[in-house]
Amino acid sequence: MPANLSSALETFKQQRDAAEAHYLKANRVSVFFREYTAAVETLLAALWAEYFQNSALCLMAVGGFGRGELYPCSDVDLAVVSPAPLSDGIQEQIARFVQTLWDCKLMPSVKSGSVDELCESVRNDITGDTAFLEARFLFGNRQTVDKLAEKMNAQRNVAAFVEAKLVEMEHRHAKSQGSGAVLEPNIKSCPGGLRDIHTLLWIAKAQGLATDLPDLLKQRILTRAEAGMLSHGYRRLAHIRIHLHLNAKRAEDRLLFDLQPQVAESMGYEGLNLRRQSEELMRVFYRAIKTVKQLGGILTPMLQSRVSSTPLRVTLRIDDDYIQVNNQIAARHTDIFFRRPEHIFKIVEIMQQRNDITALEPQTLRAWWGATRKINRSFYQNPENRRRFAGFFRNGNGLTQTLRFLNLYGVLGRYLPAWEKIIGLLQHDLFHIYPVDDHILTVVRNVRRLALDMHSHELPYASALMQSFEKQDILYLAAFFHDIAKGRGGDHAIQGIADARQFAADHFLTGEESDLLAWLVENHLLMSAVAQKEDIQDPSVLDAFCKRVQTHERLSALYLLTISDIRGTNPKLWNAWRASLLESLFHAAGRYLTGNGGNPHTLFGRRRQEAADLLTRAAVPEKQQKKLWNALGSAYFARHQSREILWHAANLVHDFETPIVRSRILPKSDSFQVMVFMPNGPRLFARLCRIFSRHGFDILAARAFITEHDYILDTFIVQIPSQHAPEDYPDIQSALEAELNSFIHGHTVAETQSRSRRISRRSRYMPIAPSITITPEEDYPDWYSVEITAVNRPFLLADMAEVFFAHNVSLRYAKISTLDERAEDSFTVFSPDLKNPKIQSSLKQTLLEQLS
């Protein structure tokens, strides 16, 4: 590199470092952009003089560089423009210029060509056209730049450009779905992100409007309040993106888990632990993108309407205050929301009741939103407003859209102060992926979908149950309030009771409705916990559950709410296995509440008789049956459900001395049920778990049983890895059975190291503290319940089984609840030694070492 360029590069580095240092001290986005852009332009001036002095070419800044919004590690978007087609020599010179930019550690993105070539290249390229929309002259022949701008503006179809940018935004938003996009959002491309702000400004500029907020204010595109809010939201997002680049030291626009604490700390969230810093950062982020989405709802249709060819304007009278304009509702006088605040809810009520109205007309929305900021205690105390708000739930029609609309524009938080506290609140528990307010509204949506025929195919049984449920509005309210007390510290289910009861009293619910609502809020985790963590074949478990539930109405409501809650927490959580657990508990509890539960001895006898009837029909002699029952022992019928007993009996009755493996694909699921029968021996359960983990199976449930003649009869439910299609299941089943058969006949299977597969980035940087509780079983000496919560990982169950074995603890039952990256496992174990506090403490400590 020539000496003069080396000097220019050194000057650039000094100016860049000074811009970053000044920013970190003064924290002003606009100053950083100005200083860093100037540093890059100074370097470009030296390079241009070196390569293109006195040439007919010109250099333009385009894209983000063109608008003066250059982030620390962003591409430097440039265009080299020639009045005539480029010769081979000029193209080689441009290539050397670009290579020097790379050598200077910039990230150049360079277009080159003649005026005609560049115009043609963007004719059908919306991205390229957008980049040139923000072009500005840097060096060279200015007349060439003017000619290019004139020609591009002349060929641009403004209406088509606007429509294409809006379609592009829709596609961008559609890609920002799923847990990764929610938990580690792309600050540039997510809904409400920086690219949405750019899109608004591009649409304005294409129409010949200004692209800076003060000028848009003068042109009456924005109100003063909107300009202030958009500017504030933009600065928030720009601050985060600058810090993100500085901490990542690369062009990283995703708020990755490992970067969230670093960004939060560098932005000044001090005095908090890493998790709280990250949560506070993400809460600021979610509120910023919410502001952008709010303004987009007003400005996008307003700007679009200026250029789009719309259908014939059809205006219909609704009442003295409102008219319908095509599919929108408009106020005759937009000051009505200030003069008569009860209309803040009335217009929403009309929109909810009318399927032919899908939105508020932009000017009406602007006025309505302005008035909502005046919602206060007096507004809440107005009985008319309370009736209308409760009516949103009683009506049900369009409930999800109504609540999301009210949440987007801040009405829910102003009307209900408890709601304000959960807006944008993240939960780093390794299974929730949405902020609390979004999660709640997703659960409301799920409950509402169960009530609609059009969605009955998703969950036919639950849908039929919901459609016959009399108090649907109370279920909607239970979904709305179930997590409203999150983030306060303590048990949110208990704390939410007071919020639910206060709402019920203020909104004219009957005492019976209030009781059901409060009970559902308090117990919304009950059914999920029992179904996923406890042995519902144990009559004492069912008895305790039903004593809490007491009525069929509560049971049905809790079942529907639980399904909707799990499905609204994380798409990965809902599967056929979890559905079958809840349905089994629901039906078992229903029989119990009807009086058909029977006492334990009757239940066990019925299970044995059902199996005996099956074997008799298969012509198995009664003498042979008795031998099997004696080998299994009476405890067997207390620990297994009827379907398992029938399956085991059919496979074991003719020979219960020879080891066998059997498996079956569970109907309508991606899971196998596997039984392993073989002579008892050391570490068998742990070694079996390792085989499943090595094949990539998730163990959903496991039951370890030792027969009277010292054989193990272990039954597993394992989930097939998601990358496999159903047509692959038989081959997977055969391969698994082959390895298990080899194992039970004494052939050594290679042991696999427990930590051979890495845990996720989320688990590494946002871990949960492992917890262990050991509780003696009532009425069963030497039996204990062990509850473990930890980060999920491969071989976790096998490792815990090894610890149990090392401490002379016999594992008899395991219920595995895998909540995405969080494991909540329940074990029933037998050990006379655990009466000794030292041994119990040693077991806990060793388990914690495995889990940490």
From Swiss-Prot:
GO MF, one annotated term: [protein-PII] uridylyltransferase activity
Catalytic activity: [protein-PII]-L-tyrosine + UTP = [protein-PII]-uridylyl-L-tyrosine + diphosphate; [protein-PII]-uridylyl-L-tyrosine + H2O = [protein-PII]-L-tyrosine + UMP + H(+)
Pfam families to which the protein is assigned, alphabetical: GlnD_UR_UTase, HD
Keywords: Hydrolase, Magnesium, Multifunctional enzyme, Nucleotidyltransferase, Repeat, Transferase
Domain notes: Has four distinct domains: an N-terminal nucleotidyltransferase (NT) domain responsible for UTase activity, a central HD domain that encodes UR activity, and two C-terminal ACT domains that seem to have a role in glutamine sensing.
Domain ACT, first and last residues per copy: 673-757, 785-852
SMART domains (UniProt xref): HDc
Ways its activity is controlled: Uridylyltransferase (UTase) activity is inhibited by glutamine, while glutamine activates uridylyl-removing (UR) activity.
Source superkingdom: Bacteria
Gene: glnD
Name of this protein: Bifunctional uridylyltransferase/uridylyl-removing enzyme
InterPro entries: ACT-like_dom_sf, ACT_dom, HD/PDEase_dom, HD_domain, NT_sf, PII_UdlTrfase/GS_AdlTrfase, UTase/UR
Cofactor(s) needed: Mg(2+)
Family to which this protein belongs: Belongs to the GlnD family.
GO BP: regulation of nitrogen utilization
HD domain ranges (all copies): 436-558
Region Uridylyl-removing, annotated ranges: 319-672
